Amino acid sequence: MLKASDLARLKASLFAGKYNLLIGAGVSLDSCEKNAIDRLPSGWEFQKHLCALKNVSSDRPLSRVYQLLNPKEIEKELTRRFSNTIPGDTVKKIPHFIWNRIYTFNIDDALEGAYGEQRDFAKQNSSSINFNKPYASSSSHKDVQIVHLHGYAREPEAGYVFSQTEYAFNSKAINPWMTVLSQTLGTEPFIISGTSLSEPDLEYYLSHRTAVSGRQDRGPSILVEPSPDAITENDCKRHGLILVKATFTEFLSWLQAELGDAPSLETIILPSIDGVFDKALPALSKISFFTSVDIVRPALPSAGGGNCQDFSSVRYQLGKI
């Protein structure tokens, strides 16, 4: 799926927790509503359903027909339908990698459900953030932020972002998450899947990215799309994205087969200082410590030569975390 040189760059950044993920409805297609029967719809299917509900032409965009919904319809068709969902195989693969941050155009909670179901195996804990929340960086890599750009079914009081007016409003600098995404998408490594490059606000974000704007010391940015057309291929060239023709679950399965299991957070973050920690101290407590403080290397000479490395007082304090 990738050239050896691109795969090597991807591995270095992915296994260091440098990759961001941007996903759309396509990654939730094998997830189900809470009745465990009806699968979650694609954006196109959902738009057609709402058009039929409001008795308008089926070619009306979702952004327009959404404005016709009354509060009860919003509760039934969006909030209840997309909350307490059952995660499918695709989103269940995401927690097996370490991500810098996850952005999603989806309002469903399938990804959160995947992290919850696999808490004993997930590389990180998840922290959900709705589009209306103030910007806050994650305190440590042990928590991955899932930023819901269009709203979140578990927080219906904040509303949903489907109208063209709201798209324009939320693509301006007054919304911190939109601003952060537009800035980081231009330079940092991203894997994008489950969404069309013609998504209204995605076009805005990509306008900040060119074929040469990505950082050369990080992995390549990738669009995973099973059925790209000529326009998609051209857009990838313009924005410096590598196009992978596959489903997202196929791509993640291929990565696991090629690269093996991603390293643990403990391996990435913790320096090698055997004997400093109490043996019973959980790994996440060690990670919290090293992502909350600066490591000061010993500089005083010891009586026997070399540097003094008496960590006994540190060991006592860490054992109390």
Segments from the language model and where they lie:
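Short catalytic helix/loop segments, enriched in acidic residues and glycine
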Residues: 36-54
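A secondary-structure boundary/capping signal
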Residues: 23, 106, 149-150, 193
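Metabolite-binding pocket within alpha/beta catalytic cores that recognizes anionic/polar moieties
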Residues: 2-4, 8-20, 27-38, 63-128, ...
